[in-house]
Amino acid sequence: MASQPDFTGRHAFVPSYSKRKSGVPYGDLVYKGRTYQQIIQQIHPTFDFRKHPFCHLDPDIYGVLKNTHAGWKPAFGQYEIPAKHLDGQGVDVGDVFLFYGMFRQTENLPDGTLHFKKGAPIQHIIYGYMVVSEILKDQDRIKELYPWHPHAASTEHPDNRLYLATDYGVFENRDSLLLSKPGQPNRRLWNLPAFCASSDVSISWQGKNTPVLVGGHAELNSACRGQEFVITAKTPELEKELRKWAESLIGHALA
């Protein structure tokens, strides 16, 4: 019988496939003793690895490469509209990225294979973070220092950059990381901390959608398109609340 990795209480974030003909193969990523290719073959048997052999490993905060490159550091890359949006929102050194994705509960079959649990919803869950320590925009340095990162192959874009961090991590699964409101089918309907419903808190990229206080949470029907939503507090009191929330997720005080 095949060995059964224990995913209890853990996230296995599977990066999307790369549109380029080069990059990190899914078979070069390892989690709990299995390659990502093996995991995907079980939960998504129709995925075509011949057509999409490479993944877009970004943000690279897991450290799941079989052969980690010398000098590996966590990095998150952006260019074009997302990069300009982050610049326009004033994102800089010291700011915190909270990474979220779509997750669905899995379970092991008796033969040891992994599959999605029947009826389990797809939910938005926060799975990791990084505190920006440097923003690298020199394209030659990106190629030289981070050759494994997908944005090392995007240096033709003048606004290409890497956000680097010394403080970063991947979370164990827990209720406080769930963004999607439980018990309903819309994964974009989020439960945020109550302070987010204040008119002095802004969440970028949401158009006319704003958080509304419902049952002790700020309920937001989050934008269906967009990658980076920047939360900004306009008063010292709300800035303190925002910081406290981030620290409660991360598990330690921010510098």
Predicted regions and their residues:
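Contiguous surface segments at macromolecular interaction interfaces
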Residues: 1-38, 122-126, 135-255
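Short N-terminal edge-element motif at the start of the domain
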Residues: 41-123
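Conserved hydrophobic positions within beta-strands
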Residues: 130-132
